[in-house]
Amino acid sequence: MFDVTVLGSANLDLVVRTERHPSPGETVLGDDFAEYPGGKGLNQAVAAARAGASTSFVGAIGTDDAGRTLRSVAEIEGIDLSQFVDRDNVPTGRALITVDHRGENSIVVVPGANATVVAPASISALVVLCQL
């Protein structure tokens, strides 16, 4: 039995910082660009594991570079991935995030493999979080 099982999304976040968000049809220059592991589910699983909880994650990724990155992050954090699925021919979820100088963000999510997540028949955990 795990302390925490998270059923949720795993995304590769593509983050650009810019002075201001563009208006429709407008192009603005970005100041910085970075990629981060993300997704509400993966973020919750990482937080639980870092807090010392034995943690499992139920989710889905593609068999692409982004999916391999997210799997590696979860493994490094000590998260059990026995119910984590690699989907062929379906891309890993992505989030395109713009952050302005005030820290306000705008997010577009492409669910990808997250749209294929299926809850297992049973979960053995003290706490279950659903973060899709």
Predicted regions and their residues:
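Glycine-rich phosphate/adenosyl-contacting loop at the front of the ribokinase-like
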Residues: 1-60, 65-69
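Short secondary-structure boundary/capping elements
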Residues: 36-43, 88-91, 114-118
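Short, basic and Ser/Thr-rich N-terminal targeting/leader segments
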Residues: 51, 77, 90-93
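Ribokinase/PfkB-type carbohydrate-kinase core domain
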Residues: 1-10, 60, 68, 72-86, ...
